[in-house]
């Protein structure tokens, strides 16, 4: 017979005391592992990260932070800077460049996106608490003193407000304040375009206090004060980012001496766009103008049309090239190249005009017949052909009646710049160059390409290496 305090089931005997102990153990396990008794909702699984690192932090009562802020702001005057009347307020600045670009050469400005940070000490914001730092949102910015920093060379500046104002405020228990904000600035950059498009520029970003001179506020750079992001995402297009440097200077004005902080971004222009759009087309047009030297001189419409077409094309190219530049009063490197190309093209047209003029104005055959019928009382002592020794080479100069024209004293001339077949023997023509009109195209075929190649050699060496 079993005891009244025990009961049995089959062959197992259970005691009420044992049952109570088991119940307590089960409740304890369930309290330690609530996941066994509660089912996670879909929202819980969405926020759950399997690789999340859990950090234990001391729990700060919300009421304590509120009390600290109320105590700090009680009697606080945000119109007065820290240590007013005692010493200047030292502000440490640093900057993170998110992106630069594009650069607008016509308006001489560039766009930059930065995170700008300022740090200073305000003894009025010291507090005693286990909390070392108060991480506050932008609502607290207007309740404490903030430096009146402005960007001196900005044409336009925008703060980011989506989805909330991109501003951050931190207050440490020793009175240190950190204030950061994100800005997009269109800053002025005076471009010197003498070497365009092989130019390099240093575009500044300058900031200082608007109303406090250096007796009131002093700016100072932090270590590693300017950092840059991934330059591959920058929209510089025609430029390459070379580097940066930061400086500090004092600017004297009628209202006082101000500490001005500057960051210079060094940019180098890429020539690819202008090589394709300007340099190669201009070179090809110049070479095309030389084709007229191989066309028969009697083909007046063909040579004239080619010359005029190349001149008009060069005029169009020079106009298009100027559209990407501001209206500066000096000559740029590209202006020089385009102008010289225009001169070569125009000279090719003038060359044919000169050749055609002297050839077409030769003496008519009827006049020659009249001269033969009524010969003048003169003695012809000119030889039909003459052998001239020049530069150790023998040249046979023959009179070419086809290209003769009326010259001094009614004499027929077969050469340009000379009125006798043997120009070297004429004392009044001593030192003159003997050029045959019929060979002007032959001379041009050599002179024009040689001169253009020499110009390119001097041009590219001067602008790229000197």
From Swiss-Prot:
Tell me how this protein sits in the membrane. Multi-pass membrane protein
State the compartments where it is located.
Postsynaptic cell membrane; Cell membrane; Cell projection, Dendrite; Cytoplasmic vesicle membrane
| Known catalytic reactions | chloride(in) = chloride(out)
Q: In which tissues is it expressed?
A: Expressed in brain (at protein level). Expressed in lungs, in alveolar epithelium.
Q: Which InterPro entries match?
A: GABAA/Glycine_rcpt, GABBAg2_rcpt, GABRG-1/4, Neur_chan_lig-bd, Neur_chan_lig-bd_sf, Neur_channel, Neuro-gated_channel_TM_sf, Neuro_actylchol_rec
Q: Which residues face the membrane's Extracellular side?
A: 39-274, 322-333, 464-466
Its domain of life?
Answer: Eukaryota
* Domain text: The extracellular domain contributes to synaptic contact formation. GABAARs subunits share a common topological structure: a peptide sequence made up of a long extracellular N-terminal, four transmembrane domains, intracellular or cytoplasmic domain located between the third and the fourth transmembrane domains.
Please name one Pfam family that this protein belongs to: Neur_chan_memb
Per the record, the gene is Gabrg2
Q: Which organism is it from?
A: Rattus norvegicus
Concerning CDD domains, the annotation shows: LGIC_ECD_GABAAR_G (cd19000), LGIC_TM_GABAAR_gamma (cd19054)
Q: Where are the transmembrane segments?
A: 275-295, 302-321, 334-358, 443-463
**Top-level taxonomy:** Eukaryota, Metazoa, Chordata, Craniata, Vertebrata
**So what family is this one in?**
Belongs to the ligand-gated ion channel (TC 1.A.9) family. Gamma-aminobutyric acid receptor (TC 1.A.9.5) subfamily. GABRG2 sub-subfamily.
PTM per Swiss-Prot/TrEMBL: Palmitoylated by ZDHHC3/GODZ; required for the accumulation of GABA(A) receptors at the postsynaptic membrane of inhibitory GABAergic synapses.
Q: At which residues is glycosylation annotated?
A: 51, 128, 246
Q: What is this protein called?
A: Gamma-aminobutyric acid receptor subunit gamma-2
Output the PANTHER family linked to this UniProt entry: NEUROTRANSMITTER GATED ION CHANNEL
- Disulfide bond positions: 189-203
Side Cytoplasmic, residues = 296-301, 359-442
Query: Record keywords: Lyase included?
Result: no
Q: What does this protein do?
A: Gamma subunit of the heteropentameric ligand-gated chloride channel gated by gamma-aminobutyric acid (GABA), a major inhibitory neurotransmitter in the brain. GABA-gated chloride channels, also named GABA(A) receptors (GABAAR), consist of five subunits arranged around a central pore and contain GABA active binding site(s) located at the alpha and beta subunit interface(s). When activated by GABA, GABAARs selectively allow the flow of chloride anions across the cell membrane down their electrochemical gradient.
